[in-house]
Amino acid sequence: MTSGLLTPIKVTKKRLLSCAAALAFSAAVPVAFAQEDTGTAITSSDNGGHPGDWLSYGRSYSEQRYSPLDQINTENVGKLKLAWHYDLDTNRGQEGTPLIVNGVMYATTNWSKMKALDAATGKLLWSYDPKVPGNIADRGCCDTVSRGAAYWNGKVYFGTFDGRLIALDAKTGKLVWSVYTIPKEAQLGHQRSYTVDGAPRIAKGKVLIGNGGAEFGARGFVSAFDAETGKLDWRFFTVPNPENKPDGAASDDILMSKAYPTWGKNGAWKQQGGGGTVWDSLVYDPVTDLVYLGVGNGSPWNYKFRSEGKGDNLFLGSIVAINPDTGKYVWHFQETPMDEWDYTSVQQIMTLDMPVNGEMRHVIVHAPKNGFFYIIDAKTGKFITGKPYTYENWANGLDPVTGRPNYVPDALWTLTGKPWLGIPGELGGHNFAAMAYSPKTKLVYIPAQQIPLLYDGQKGGFKAYHDAWNLGLDMNKIGLFDDNDPEHVAAKKDFLKVLKGWTVAWDPEKMAPAFTINHKGPWNGGLLATAGNVIFQGLANGEFHAYDATNGNDLYSFPAQSAIIAPPVTYTANGKQYVAVEVGWGGIYPFLYGGVARTSGWTVNHSRVIAFSLDGKDSLPPKNELGFTPVKPVPTYDEARQKDGYFMYQTFCSACHGDNAISGGVLPDLRWSGAPRGRESFYKLVGRGALTAYGMDRFDTSMTPEQIEDIRNFIVKRANESYDDEVKARENSTGVPNDQFLNVPQSTADVPTADHP
């Protein structure tokens, strides 16, 4: 289905029959779809139109995630009950925003699957599996997630992790067209490690889709396809062609004239692609008739390796506005020039109307990874103001005229050549979890967090590895040492002391927090605001909450059995208001940070969609709380080999199976797996890809058999030195690990402020 590149697959009767196993089936949708133009309907959503639907990723083009529904409100939300649940077929991370159109819910799930459900009952109407190959999993940094779909005139559109964009008939689930979005002929870097996990957006009949991959090696771009035919309309690259040549794209003129001079004439960007992937936020604004792109980090992260430590590297860490008809550049605002911290600008872009110096302005409000809350003019891109929404130690504020950061000298770690502990770290003060805005309270609700990172350069200069992250960082220092060395124990305590998660209700007029809601740890779900003066949010500890939007008081809590990182939606079906959310623990925090992620709350995945109403009568089945249980490891390993294996593990394995071989609860904990117990069994798994179909790719082209054996010895060593602690943590009446990370208690300190961590 990926052949033909930009030529959409032509759907014939024969092709449909031959693909029957992968196509959707079952009964017709029991509702009538509206005949109104979808663009008009989405536009009206900001003005009270279609209150019972959720037609676009952020509900409306403004992406405020605000619903005018108020059947559920502060007076009765405490009476919410589970109305229905639908168990998913993949117990991995779920980040999707379901769409609801005339009583039908369209939910994208892990491995890029699409489910159409009756929004009133949760009954499956049809299902579509694009059959993403398992070996594609290691091309992505952060789980095989999908953040959502788009709806347009009777069709639903979604991206697949292997780079396709698919259009389905919304009523039947049958394939209309499919196109591969990654052009073979383009200069995209040597790695070409592209994935699609973001939700497409539709602007004036064009389906917009970006991609990810900068951790491995990629050159960012956004493509626009005709919603009816799947034909490519235009493409915009976000960083220059390495030879400063035209790509035959809408971005040619601006990249060659303005962006290319901001990059070093040499550097790893010319081989790695430079980065700048648009993996999440794409927004069409009908008020300005512009499309806003949130542009990501550099590839590699290391600024000195990437660009010789020269130039601002446009358009990394920027919001770029382009013409939706032509894809041509209109303006840009760079939030993080010279990015060397993975401070992406792909976080949710939101538009709203608000007073600025006594005048109503149409603005973009943005809370990217770097910790600053920005307000910029939506028409011109002119900086209006910016303040930290959390503690940050990389900049001494922003220039009041230009918005350029005033760098802390030590934060420029690639130029000083010295390690630097950054707050925020690479996961940002705010990541993909969606924020929301209420026009009633005039507050923006941000799922904020604080996860530091020690930045230090790759030893011996930049070296790229196939099938691995290529950041230009010392991967041995990206996590926490896990032993009884007093210095390492002290370092863990210091780390956990500043590890936090909270929701900040930000007043964009005062540029200050109105209130905050403390959570157990970071990596919590997105927000929903409603006219009932309620905000809804799922948490990493497995709870689903409703808070008073005016003061943050906790009004309702439901044990969802698994962590929630997705944002909720609300809608009506048969005249009744529901609130729904996807459940499932995943993403890069539990993948890479492993055991540290346990401090947000122990959770075992039971991935599903859950929906609430005031008269719900459903209940969840019993849950498995134990997760991966310790198994007595083989007692012997080679000390010299395990030392070499530590570097190889951190380079090739930690991004999925956790720092220092401690799983964060999504993928198998290799310490307790049977594979490392023998050399041959481990090589079959890692070298020959015995579990490729399940997402564990083969690495015999990336590592030698001896290097794979080194990794096995390291895992056995880690199993032996952590087994007793893991068993001890489960010595209680439930058998569930207690609230500790290797006997280092989590801090209960207050959330950080702008001037204190």
Swiss-Prot record:
Catalytic EC class: oxidoreductase
Active site: 342
Region (Disordered): 726-757
A UniProt-annotated Pfam family: PQQ
CDD domains given in the database record: PQQ_ADH_II
One GO MF term: oxidoreductase activity, acting on CH-OH group of donors
Sorted UniProt keywords: Calcium, Cell membrane, Disulfide bond, Electron transport, Heme, Iron, Membrane, Metal-binding, Oxidoreductase, PQQ, Pyrrolidone carboxylic acid, Respiratory chain, Signal, Transport
Cofactor note: Binds 1 PQQ group per subunit.
Control of this protein's activity: 2,6-dichloro-4-dicyanovinylphenol (PC16) and antimycin A inhibit ubiquinol oxidation activity more selectively than the ubiquinone reductase activity.
pH dependence: Optimum pH is 5 for ubiquinol oxidation activity.
Disulfide linkage: 141-142
Induction (UniProt): Constitutively expressed.
Residues recorded as bearing Pyrrolidone carboxylic acid in the entry: 35
The EC number(s) this enzyme carries: 1.1.5.5
PROSITE patterns assigned to the protein according to its UniProt record, in alphabetical order: BACTERIAL_PQQ_1, BACTERIAL_PQQ_2, CYTC
UniProt: heme c binding residues: 653, 656-657, 696
Residues where pyrroloquinoline quinone binds: 95, 147, 277, 369, 588
Major location category of this protein: membrane
Sequence ranges of Polar residues compositional bias: 732-750
SUPFAM superfamilies: Cytochrome c, Quinoprotein alcohol dehydrogenase-like
Positions bound to Ca(2+): 215, 297, 342
Cofactor(s) recorded in Swiss-Prot or TrEMBL: pyrroloquinoline quinone; Ca(2+); heme c
Function: Dehydrogenase component of the alcohol dehydrogenase multicomponent enzyme system which is involved in the production of acetic acid and in the ethanol oxidase respiratory chain. Quinohemoprotein alcohol dehydrogenase (ADH) catalyzes the oxidation of ethanol to acetaldehyde by transferring electrons to the ubiquinone embedded in the membrane phospholipids. The electrons transfer from ethanol to membranous ubiquinone occurs from pyrroloquinoline quinone (PQQ) to one heme c in subunit I (AdhA), and finally to two heme c in subunit II (AdhB).
Assembly and interaction partners: The alcohol dehydrogenase multicomponent enzyme system is composed of a dehydrogenase subunit I (AdhA), a cytochrome c subunit II (AdhB) and a subunit III (AdhS).
Listed name of the protein: Alcohol dehydrogenase (quinone), dehydrogenase subunit
Originating species: Gluconobacter oxydans (strain 621H)
Gene encoding the protein: adhA
